[in-house]
Amino acid sequence: ASPTLLRPHALEALRFAVDENVAKLAALLRTLGFDAAYDRRFGDGRIARLAAEEGRVVLSRDRALLKRGEIVWGRLVRAAQPLDQLLEVLDLFGVRRAPAPFSRCLRCNVVLTPVDKRDILHRLEPKTRLYYHAFRLCPSCGRIFWQGSHHEHMRRVLSEAGVILPDDDPAAGP
């Protein structure tokens, strides 16, 4: 059957466009490995165009944004707290297993790449240099990621919320 207004064509992948009203949700989605476009400088028009051009689901608490004609897929996020917002979105799409946890830059949304410790040694704090060996780098902003205390804290928070995270692969990094 061909697409109609009530049955638009299917999404190729679960990708999101997040607005300022649910900004912290973007970082949580990225933590799980979802492609979640967000930039605080984006206005409603830019978000709507991005969603239309890239086949993204718009997540917002702004009804006016979601009523824009260009938006094919959107969700009015009802929860007020970021973790509750995440669970609301995951429930909506029937997702409980994180697709690729700790694989994206929380700031840029870019997929992280493994980096040899020797190449970034000069950028590491002394204790990080001593205790950690697997690192990933954001090719866009240059941020370095590793499985430190923040990583463990986020795993615990997400697991306690019911999100299924695969066991860590030490060779893969965060």
Regions found by a protein language model. Give the residues of each.
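Short cysteine/histidine-rich metal-coordination sites, predominantly Zn2+-binding motifs
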Residues: 119-130, 153-164
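Residues immediately within or flanking Cys/His clusters that coordinate Zn2+
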Residues: 102, 135
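Long, charged N-terminal interaction/targeting segments
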Residues: 1-100
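GST superfamily/GST-like fold recognition
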Residues: 147-152
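Short, glycine-/small-residue-rich phosphate/pyrophosphate-handling segment
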Residues: 103-104, 116
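Short cysteine-rich clusters marking metal-coordination/redox-active sites
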Residues: 105-108, 138-141
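Short functional micro-motifs and their immediate structural scaffolds
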Residues: 110-117, 146
